[in-house]
From Swiss-Prot:
InterPro entries cross-referenced by the UniProt entry: Ankyrin_rpt, Ankyrin_rpt-contain_sf, F-box-like_dom_sf, SecEffector_AnkRepeat
UniProt-recorded name of the protein: Putative ankyrin repeat protein R784
Pfam families: Ank_2 (PF12796)
ANK repeats: 44-70, 71-101, 102-131, 179-205, 206-235, 237-264, 265-294, 296-321, 322-351, 380-409
SUPFAM superfamilies hit by this protein: Ankyrin repeat, F-box domain
Keywords linked to the UniProt accession: ANK repeat, Repeat
PROSITE patterns reported for this sequence: ANK_REP_REGION (PS50297), ANK_REPEAT (PS50088)
Superkingdom, natural source: Viruses
Length: 433
């Protein structure tokens, strides 16, 4: 069996022309004899450093960092922080006598990847005063608490320490309310209950604005915590709309329960629910009086644009007006599920009509049902077929031909009458199906 590691260098240099730069780096780290591959192939130094950090190869890094400029070293710091390579960071920091390598990205990356020992080391080294925003984004209470304690380490009263530090930061950055306004809002936006609870426990007054970010986060426990500690659900549309955007059904139900908003006068709330695709919220709003029949079936068009077949089905069952535009949008964008929902619903309507006619001899057909059934006539299906063909939606065309075999004759006519369509579609794929 051939030992590939002992092939002559000339062979490896030749192989280097046929493999990726990252694979060359990996070869170099397997055996230091292959390091000449790196220089021979003129590989980007950042890629070499990146790979070396990933495998924690101190030898390669020490060999390269002496020739690396400040920006390159910052890159090494960031990548090492992300991968938790503490020894590499300490090795570089020892050579940084003028704080040239101060880089908040490295601190944020270490917090993001939860290598908090690296975060604390860098914060201490460069005497960072402001708590990095990533601690609030990722809910690293360890870092937040440690930095507060670090600000007033001689004070034995923890609650007093927190409040004094908050007041200090507020006074220092009052021009844009850097800490107190923005950072805790981030914790609310990302739904970190434990971080918000920490500030409440340490006598920080709760702001009404936090409730909006909590509704947006979709964390129901956080919303209840803030309401329990002074936030109020006013009867305004903005909070309801924010909760709907967040997409948590329990939060929306909770807000509706504690407010007196007339949803019949608030079509915007329904539009948001449809655009975000939350069928549960759509049903909830309807049960609370929200209108779905406004603007000649605008609801149906919005649902079709988003490709939400379950919402389209719900609207059909509730007899929302449906124009051909709904099917046109679905055909153009390739939303086969919406086409299927419509045809299935139309077939059910037709079956009901036929069964009643057989038993009673006649029946009064609802206008909505009559309209839906008429859309499925060949002429209207022809339109859907053309829209699908023009936009190369072969899956929809295939489905239509399966359900309506007579459309194949119409398809041939369309191809003959409109040769420009045949140029835009994959005919082989179509006829294969």
């Amino acid at each position: 069996m051939i030992n590939w590691l002992h092939l002559p260098d000339e062979i490896w240099l030749l192989i280097g022309n046929f493999i990726s730069d990252r694979e060359i780096c990996c070869l170099a780290f397997v055996n230091t004899r292959f390091l000449n591959l790196l220089s021979y192939n003129k590989i980007n130094q950042n890629l070499v450093l990146e790979c070396a950090i990933e495998v924690d190869n101190i030898y390669i890094i020490n060999k390269l960092i002496d020739k690396t400029d400040v920006n390159g070293l910052k890159f090494v710091m960031r990548w090492s922080a992300l991968h938790g390579s503490f020894q590499i960071i300490k090795s570089i920091i020892r050579k940084d006598h003028n704080n040239d390598l101060l880089d908040l990205h490295a601190i944020n990356w270490s917090i993001e990847s939860n290598h908090l020992h690296i975060s604390k080391y860098l914060i201490d080294k460069y005497n960072i005063v402001i708590i990095p925003e990533s601690a609030f984004i990722y809910g690293r209470l360890d870092i937040i608490d440690w930095m507060f304690s670090r600000q007033n380490q001689n004070n034995a009263n923890k609650k007093s320490t927190i409040k004094k530090t908050v007041d200090f930061l507020k006074s220092k950055f009052i021009s844009h309310d850097y800490f107190y306004d923005s950072m805790i809002e981030l914790a609310c936006l990302y739904g970190h209950v434990h971080v918000v609870q920490y500030f409440i426990d340490n006598q920080c007054s709760v702001r009404q604005k936090w409730l909006y970010y909590s509704c947006l986060s979709g964390n129901f426990d956080l919303v209840k915590l803030l309401c329990k500690n002074g936030c109020r659900i006013f009867s305004n549309r903005r909070l309801i709309n924010t909760a709907i955007t967040g997409g948590n059904l329990d939060i929306v139900r909770y807000c509706l329960l504690h407010s007196k908003i007339d949803l019949a006068q608030n079509n915007f709330a329904m539009k948001i629910a449809i655009k975000t695709g939350h069928i549960g919220i759509v049903r909830l709003l309807v049960s609370h009086g929200s209108d779905i029949h406004f603007d000649n079936g605008e609801c149906m068009i919005i649902a079709s644009r988003g490709g939400f077949a379950n919402i389209v089905k719900f609207f059909l069952e509730n007899k929302v007006y449906m124009s051909e535009k709904v099917l046109k949008i679905a055909a153009i964008r390739g939303y086969l599920d919406i086409i299927k929902v419509f045809i299935k619903y139309a077939s059910a309507c037709m079956s009901n009509i036929n069964s009643v006619c057989k038993s009673n001899g006649s029946m009064v057909v609802d206008n909505h049902i009559n309209y839906i059934v008429n859309i499925t006539r060949n002429f209207n299906m022809r339109k859907i077929l053309i829209w699908s063909l023009i936009n190369n939606r072969i899956n929809i065309v295939t489905y239509l031909l399966e359900i309506f075999p007579k459309l194949r004759e119409i398809l041939n006519q369309i191809m003959y009458q409109h040769p420009e369509i045949s140029e835009k579609i994959d005919l082989d794929s179509l006829y294969k199906n």
